[in-house]
């Protein structure tokens, strides 16, 4: 932060890392990427080469737990009024409880793995997070929510392949997507 502010100051500019410095522009997120590995750190447990999305059942359950607990989790990952101002449709900030492959408007994005290295590089990203959070609380909440999804064998529903904000209210309701 200090480096960014110092460089901006030297250029006669003002830098802001606030979640939503201007109401009509995209804000500043601090998204959380995660993967789950075996105890030896050799196998990415999110990956399944036989699944169309390349995700394991564990990945789906963990992601479903995060989505199910997202309303409460937001208190930890986006803890300020300004944080909530950032969570608006069409600003790449996850205004809806949806997930999808490389869907930058979904709350949980399946980040494509590096080509040819998907087994070791596929990961999930929580977009509803910013730098005003306490990372220990945010990560603790994320892990607890995900583990609840695993314990309850939750399923996240179908992937959302388009911006959920472009769906009608009825389409979002049919898919279980909430704001």
Model regions: which residues?
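Histidine-centered divalent-metal-coordination microenvironment in nucleic-acid enzymes
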Residues: 18-42
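Catalytic-core signal marking the mid-to-C-terminal active-site face
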Residues: 3-9, 13-16, 39-179
């Amino acid at each position: 932060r200090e480096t960014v502010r110092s460089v901006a100051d030297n250029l006669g500019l003002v830098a802001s890392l606030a979640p939503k410095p201007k109401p009509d522009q995209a804000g500043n997120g601090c998204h959380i990427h995660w993967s789950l590995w075996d105890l030896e750190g050799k196998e990415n447990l999110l990956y399944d080469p036989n699944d169309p999305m390349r995700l394991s059942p564990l990945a789906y359950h963990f992601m479903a737990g995060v989505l199910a607990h997202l309303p409460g989790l937001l208190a930890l990952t986006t803890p300020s009024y300004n944080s909530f101002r950032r969570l608006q449709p069409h600003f790449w900030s996850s205004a809806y409880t949806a997930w999808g492959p490389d869907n930058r408007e979904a709350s949980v994005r399946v980040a494509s793995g590096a080509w040819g290295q998907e087994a070791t590089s596929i990961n999930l990203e929580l977009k509803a997070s910013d730098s005003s959070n306490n990372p220990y609380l945010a990560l603790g909440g994320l892990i607890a929510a995900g583990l609840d999804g695993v314990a309850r064998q939750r399923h996240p529903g179908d992937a959302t392949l388009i911006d959920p904000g472009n769906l009608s209210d009825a389409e979002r309701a049919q898919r279980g997507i909430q704001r």
